[in-house]
């Protein structure tokens, strides 16, 4: 997951690109797109030059109109909150980092892309990526390729698959670093948000 | 008479030469007056490096027009910007639109990646010195596992501690402008904007450019507003200010100019029943102007706009010569030959010329080239105008050519009832009252040389400028630091020393940041220090890198390999290398490179709080080769020094003129000067009482006032007998014309013209009223003096 944020920031600092259409209406129809969606994630990273993969896990929430919460619980607890105008990184209650749109105008763009990625909003993603997809009765697969060369170089290739929700995200970077994220236990509606999570929004 | 014809013919030849030379200069050479106000500084104070830094910062900024086209959404903003651009493209060659280089986007980071160990932010450098190894290990682990810990560029092993990523982020924040879809993009809470940097092809101060650019920008903005809903167009540029100023000025020229022309025509008509006198007076002044331009160009090879404008106003005194002759012609017996009349007037005419020329030449003894040029310009102009009167007027105006109008008779009669100044109790009381009032006014007199107080831009322009400044967080082009050194390395090192001083000012919000080449290319010394610092604090055996390996279950081989990868030998990044890469494009203007024997650069300031200027002025004190530059302050100080020198020149001129008058008038010499001196004192007192700060333009007007006032004094003292109306008529006509031509400028809303005009208005009126009071008493029942017919 970190790759996505990092690469997006880096790339967005440099550029962004837009527009075209892909036959993705079927996939769009399969996606549930709830207002509130929370679940569990398991992330595995294979970094260039390292023998062992790095595993981490935690919870995530996507709230329409508000933003994204990404809570890593293991091995080091920390929380990331992305809203329209800022990105805040908490370690416990302490704010370890805050990036707001005033400082960095691309924050809004990053956050909207991330929100789209987690909720599977392909129409939105098309502004930055060439989207190629296929769908059958039980699920769908999509490959994203950044339209701008700089973004493509920074992010590499992104693949998503899922059904009513996004199930897997795979990112392969040009540098050789790879990241796999698996989503599970997805719940929707206001009740899906734990009290401590609701408090953070 | 024949002798005079020869004289007139000779003068006609000279005038033909003048016309030829001027035609050659303006049409052949196409000379353009200097406009840079710093060219008016004494030569030894001019500094080639400073000049070049100005041309990098200010001249470039003068030609720029920055336009932001914004809409609530990005697609709308792009449509509006396209519509805007299409209108601009319809007039090619006027405004050039900068093209965005797509290649520059993709390889933005490449030049830096090879040098990443030496590229650190100030905070990172402090942390490297102060923080324990556990801080760095924890930091790297958090970055490894957390979803987001700032930007990371390339593989983890390239930048395990996130130092390079942090540096890139800090660099990106030097400007909020981002490339997006092949355009430049900024945003605020309400709108997304496309930034259109435009460059004006013609000079910003040329009237043609202003007249063409403004309507074009207006049409473009209208097209943009039609292209999408909620569009906002914000524009700023020197040309917009210049255009606003000249449209205000030309509007005023129309009203004030027409008013004063109508007044002069009516006045002349009612006095002479003819318009010929105006034609003649204008002829003499015109020849004076052309003559001084020729002579100045031959002497100096250049003319400054300020010299031209001020010099031309000072030549205005020359109307007195023509008026004096014409009024005497009117009063004299029509049978009297004009050449003989002139012979009689010659001593007083000569004296007035000499007084004005000597007065103006006082300006030549100041160290400022602008004032010297002005002195030569106006003195030469007066001589030429005077010679025109002397050589041509007697032939052009014969006896009986002029008839006295009703106005002249009524006005002339008023002289007989005018009060006369006699030393006595009443006069002393009046003098004492005057002294008290004047003293009070003077005590409240202040000076203001701030160039900004000479401008009154429309509020719309000011608010656009503020919005633009906020959105772009751009540095000010007129206040910055100039850094010099023997080599580029020395310059970079001094920049770094300066930046250490500026950091606390950023923290104190005096500035929001600074732009410097050393932000991108640290000095070689700093780069070496940083590599050593990173190596010793992070990469050493048992240090954070080894501990990080342990924490994630990697062996010693991993740490060793990563260490070797990071420490791969790198030559330091050099300024020259950086400047040859695309990412340096926005920063190239900061680097002056080698100028003569030194290297120089600019450190520009963003988000300057003007209240903090005194702090900034001294921020670089004590660092060798660092100089604070404030062009606004510089120009203001030039104006201030000109004001002071000119003030002294006025005083010296009074002394010189008095010395000149002494041999002819002896005990009456003071009577010639007193009206002008009193009027000047009173005018300054009025300025003090009405809380108008003193400017260069007030003092300039006082100089002109001395020129005209002395003429009036001489005219009246030459024929003090009150039965002779000719001098009184000449004074009245000259003064009325001066008030109509210069004094009406007091109605102008352009501050410089207002200051000049108001001083002339009050001063001339007072001299006019006072001058008959000081004529010496004559035995008016005795014979008419020998000097009258």
Predicted regions and their residues:
Chain A
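Solvent-exposed coil/turn segments that connect beta secondary-structure elements
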Residues: 42-44, 65-67, 73-75, 85-87, ...
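Bacterial N-terminal signal peptides
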Residues: 6-16
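Amphipathic hydrophobic-ligand
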Residues: 52-59
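Flexible, surface-exposed loop/linker segments and immediately adjacent secondary-structure boundaries
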Residues: 94-141
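N-terminal leader/targeting segments and the immediate start of mature chains
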Residues: 19-40, 46-51, 197-201
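Positively charged n-region of N-terminal signal peptides that target proteins for export
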Residues: 1-4
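An acidic-aromatic
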Residues: 59-109, 179, 185
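Gly/Pro-enriched, hydrophobic low-complexity segments
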Residues: 122-201
